[in-house]
Amino acid sequence: MAGGPVITEDDRCGHFALPIEGLLINGTQEWEGAVNQKQHKHLSAMCRCGKVKFEAVGPPILTGSCYCTSCQEAGRQLEQLASAPPVLDPDSGTSLILYRKDRVQCVMGQQYLEEHRLKPDSPTRRVIAQCCNSAMFLDFTKGHWLSMFRNRFPTGAPPLEMRVMTKERRVGVELADDLPNYSGHSGKFMLKLIAAWIAMGFRRPESTLGKTVHRV
């Protein structure tokens, strides 16, 4: 596979395969931040009932809201689970905070995590805390990042930087001009993902959180 990031039909919510063949960059070193993680800010994400807790270390890759049809469909279906808290924002967007996979860990309640996929063979999985059906994160399994649901951070969540895939937003939604609104994905979005991958030494750590595969 050559060239830039590839988007498949099921991956329109910004979860890309980033082929190393297309990045001819020499002298890449492992990210040094892991040595001094105590110097970085920790943010905690929790399920609604408090049984599941995640910690994210350091600054996120980016924070944005996605309006793709896949995120909207998954959000609607996850919200239909018993007593589930909201996933979608009122304007049909899904607010996400993207972190490197090696900077997010579940520190409490891992046994409650359960993954859901729109299709059995989808590379994108959404992991909920089944204790209260709170959506915790989205994992594009071929990527190097996790997309944490922003509404699961009770405090300290960084503000949104952009809106993406706005061409697929719900009919009738008028977006404010307080943020950059991109009909697809922006160059800034892509560059930040690639920069994070370079800093990771082109590694793609696997997230094993959530065991059972379900179709939502």
Model-flagged regions — what are they?
Residues 7-9:
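Intrinsic low-complexity, disordered N-terminal segments enriched in polar/charged/small residues
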Residues 24:
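Small, basic N-terminal interaction modules of short regulatory proteins
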Residues 27, 31-46, 52-216:
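A short Gly-Trp-Pro
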